[in-house]
UniProtKB/Swiss-Prot annotation:
Its main location: cytoplasm. A divalent metal cation binds at residues 977, 979, 1086, 1138. Gene3D superfamilies: Cysteine proteinases, Ribonuclease H-like superfamily/Ribonuclease H, YVTN repeat-like/Quinoprotein amine dehydrogenase. InterPro entries: Exonuclease_RNaseT/DNA_pol3 (IPR013520), PAN2 (IPR030843), PAN2-PAN3_catalytic_subunit (IPR050785), PAN2_N (IPR048841), PAN2_UCH_dom (IPR028881), Papain-like_cys_pep_sf (IPR038765), RNaseH-like_sf (IPR012337), RNaseH_sf (IPR036397). Belongs to the peptidase C19 family. PAN2 subfamily. It comes from Mus musculus. Pfam families: PAN2_N (PF20770), RNase_T (PF00929), UCH_1 (PF13423). This is PAN2-PAN3 deadenylation complex catalytic subunit Pan2. Positively regulated by the regulatory subunit PAN3. Its EC number is 3.1.13.4.
Amino acid sequence: MNFEGLDPGLAEFSPAMHSTLDPVLDAHLNPSLLQNVELDPEGVALEALPVQESVHIMEGVYSELHSVVAEVGVPVSVSHFDLHEEMLWVGSHGGHATSFFGPALERYSSFQVNGGDDIRQIQSLENGILFLTKNNLKYMARGGLIIFDYLLDENEDMHSVLLTDNSTLLVGGLQNHVLEIDLNTVQETQKYAVETPGVTIMRQTNRFFFCGHTSGKVSLRDLRSFKVEHEFDAFSGSLSDFDVHGNLLAACGFSSRLTGLACDRFLKVYDLRMMRAITPLQVHVDPAFLRFIPTYTSRLAIISQSGQCQFCEPTGLANPADIFHVNPVGPLLMTFDVSASKQALAFGDSEGCVHLWTDSPEPSFNPYSRETEFALPCLVDSLPPLDWSQDLLPLSLIPVPLTTDALLSDWPAANSAPAPRRAPPVDAEILRTMKKVGFIGYAPNPRTRLRNQIPYRLKESDHEFDNFSQVTESPTGREEEPLHTVSKKYRKVTIKYSKLGLEDFDFKHYNKTLFAGLEPHIPNAYCNCMIQVLYFLEPVRCLIQNHLCQKEFCLACELGFLFHMLDLSRGDPCQGSNFLRAFRTIPEASALGLILADSDEASGKGSLARLIQRWNRFILTQLHQDMQELEVPQAYRGAGGSFCSSGDSIIGQLFSCEMENCSLCRCGSETVRASSTLLFTLSYPEDKTGKNYDFAQVLKRSICLEQNTQAWCDNCEKYQPTIQTRNIRHLPDILVINCEVNSSKEADFWRLQAEVAFKIAVKKYGGEMKSKEFALADRKELRSPEGFLCSSIEELKNVWLPFSIRMKMTKNKGLDVCNWADEHELSSLGAPSQWGPARAEEELGVYVYDLMATVVHILDSRTGGSLVAHIKVGETYHQRKEGVTHQQWYLFNDFLIEPIDKYEAVQFDMNWKVPAILYYVKRNLNSRYNLNIKNPIEASVLLAEASLARKQRKTHTTFIPLMLNEMPQVGDLVGLDAEFVTLNEEEAELRSDGTKSTIKPSQMSVARITCVRGQGPNEGIPFIDDYISTQEQVVDYLTQYSGIKPGDLDAKISSKHLTTLKSTYLKLRFLIDIGVKFVGHGLQKDFRVINLMVPKDQVLDTVYLFHMPRKRMISLRFLAWYFLDLKIQGETHDSIEDARTALQLYRKYLELSKNGTEPESFHKVLKGLYEKGRKMDWKVPEPESQTSPKNAAVFSVLAL
């Protein structure tokens, strides 16, 4: 090839000048490359780009024609020549797309495709452009209008698309499958399994699909079935790029070396006729991209990321003279593409610049391009200036375009109607105490407001429209009007209920992470934030889940069940209904005032800060007691059983701090008593001079407490003034601190210390309060122990709490405490350290505690306030949920979860954000404990157990327990149905327009759970039919729908097989853990009320199996009549009948759909079902005899 006019020095190639390309620099090998590139908008100036006024292009020789900036400082992630118009498309790492028209690269359009993810591939179609990001496929017009936006699963990590025909698209990524999407219906039609995961490059010929894998392999797949026909193991490390032309396949990649992966300078070439490799081609650059450019011959273009480009024949030898250099503005080339006409090459670099190389002065991108549509030019050249300083200037001088349409000002008054002010919501106390006579309700006056006075601004309108700022309440209870606003993410979140309940509420809007939130509508759910804190303590999470005892209302067991649900959830909120149910039964909780009435919780009466601090002390004590009662070495077998006790527990090992209390009488008599505590309460100094105190000083004063009090002296035999001191013997692994900011005195102390600390920081770092940046030397001093760099001194406002503290036990039973950051700064400045060598710290009794969580009270007079938590989530949680290893602070506000800056966790504006609880953990805490979770639930929970009911007879048994040879296996079918009773009625209001608005849904409790065998000779026979004993007051038994009658749940008079909720819960948990598949009708609601999290692949719900999109759900009774010719649920519901019917419907579904292989024929059956339902108004015809099928043949297990 002729390369005349190029610099001869480019032909002199020195391997020493070109280091081995790091494999992590390649975007196909390491898709997270672009996420680690620092974006510097000021790094590239437009004036610095070399733009030549005239470019001399030699025919047949590629030379640079133009260079333009797509987005300053943002790396180019993909480039693509439009296949229909003379345009070049460029996607950036910031999710922005830009198009350039013609070889002059005139900017045509520019718009944002995705707010956070980079654009990974672009595909042009006739009517628009397809953009692929991590888990989103967006089809947009060339001007930027969205045609469709298809959201993939959050767990997907897509990298490549391939257009197989005009309406079918293949999408591949780092998963073990490739999706086929129909562009006409915008639906996923097929999911092809891939044996080797990681499909990042796809090509197509008239014979095969070619898939390039991150493992270094290239697979050839059938065009119809997508099955592997052949596979080339190209590279031992990873694949960088490959291309196919004719009967040749060329690939470049990385090979494994002793020091890791290295770029392989041998291109692998394969003959597709013989399906074998031919002589590899050695090149003189580090290949990162390659393309066939078949103009005259099948030559290859090989590109390195440093900008070197070499042309060679795939079956010949590479000549070092055939190398030219692209001059990128950034250090790396990120993309490369060739136009359809092979006349133009496009390169994108890491600084956002695009370089166009052509082989002719006037190239065309496509052989036959259609005309591009441009925007209409402005029809008005100029308008006369108007002097707005003239007050009498008539507005009619402003020219407006002529229009034939009616103007809004011409709207007739007859078609207008006044909008009256909405009626205020009825007071919750009135609704609670209201009695009804017919349709009229009456209630006593709650005396909460003056006569004939209604607030102008209604609370409900504030929730529905975010037009008014939330005004906070003073933390000290003062009556003045506060002036500070509450940030939106800290406000109390509420669930908006519709006629579909929670199904159409978008929880993803509040939580974009994969961590699970907690629902707030359950009574006493104010402790949600503390449940999250305990869950993200890794030793607590693991060790609590290993606990299982025989106590019915054990908080440790219920907390372990809740933690298990939080582990399984992938971003969906959970509810702690069973845990809070057990919590309400603890007498100590009621005695401490921890059980709130619904009206008190809704109105925010009482101090939530004091409440959560009492709850914190109670839960640690209760868990300590529950964990002391060790279970016998067998599975849970009912309500009875024996315990063996122990003096210590896992909670005690984690939280307990051994103390020594010394009482010294004035007579000289000294009494020493040992004790332990699970948490500490801050005790603030009485100093009113405004002295500066470190947090460590206040903490030490609170731990090593000294006070004068009257106490009994055995020597004096009377009460005497004594000096009581408290010394510490052993430091806990987790340091829990109650802040006790309950009055203006403590609030003023925090505010004063934060102001003093901020002034010291300003003075120390030589900046002013208005400065936003520091000098380099000062920025180094602001580096925290976790590597965080504070970019602005404004972030240190309202910060007094340190992120780390160091504690040391002295030889004279004393305790030294200091802020770790302060000591770190002193040592970095060369000052001597008082703690000794770091590697011998623990041997010397020195420990570092890192802040893990802060629980704060949000003061808001409009909503009554709320409790939120800032939690530092560790690497193990991110690895399990997000698939990444890093630490991050998050805000947990019930079901709202949002990542935050670490300084936000310690910024306490005492006007609305008051600290309540602090959690510090020892550094490297997880390495001190065995964190393996062993499922404590065994198969014996399914065996026969005694009933709690005293009057039950064996002749009335409605189920046969499983035998040992019938134990379920993975994939077995189990029919399930549950019946419920109502504990609290729904709270709703009727609006002025006649619509009903649900304020609070009814609280349901499970009353009966039935499981029937799904296969085998005893198919359809139940093996669980448990009635759940309840101690709570039942408002409505719902006998018409549940079949539950008063007395069925009372152990004294019930004749049913009565058991505890925990016993039946363990049976279902075992079935879920073993991997059975549940068949039922409306299982989503059943599992929600039972408080179980079941993987979606283990749920076969006939509600959705016999459902068409955007159509109504069909009842089990109608489905049974239509498909099975059965008439069920005649007088009441029976869970055995419903579970068996759901199993039969599932068998019918498999029969009609041919095991799911013929969806089209089954779709026709559903059409007929919906047509029949509309004709009959979805009502089953009444039988000739009013006797129900159940009365005609009563089911008896013993008769089978």
